[in-house]
Amino acid sequence: MATKKGASSSSNGRDSEAKRLGVKRFGGQQVKAGEILIRQRGTKFHPGVNVGRGGDDTLFALKAGAVQFSTKRNRRLVNIVEDEAVEA
């Protein structure tokens, strides 16, 4: 049995880099179209009105307005409520 490790062996792997996941815009905050609302793995939050979902499950605003969180059928939804003043 060898008392030394092989030439190409390593002393354990290293920890991975943090992915900066989480809610980026909170309820009541004003956002512009295209702004990222939530970065997530899987659909912890689901897209609601005026919210899109990217390939990596990132939720983003499709229109400008205020962020609103709600629940429907045990799903947490993220909606964008448009301002009437902005449209006029």
From Swiss-Prot:
Polar residues compositional bias, start-end: 1-13
Span list, region Disordered: 1-23
Keyword set includes Ribonucleoprotein: yes
Any single GO CC term annotated in Swiss-Prot or TrEMBL for this entry: cytosolic large ribosomal subunit
A molecular function GO annotation: structural constituent of ribosome
Keywords: Ribonucleoprotein, Ribosomal protein
A single BP term in Gene Ontology: translation
PANTHER family attached to this UniProt entry: LARGE RIBOSOMAL SUBUNIT PROTEIN BL27M, RIBOSOMAL PROTEIN L27
Official protein name in the record: Large ribosomal subunit protein bL27
Gene coding for it: rpmA
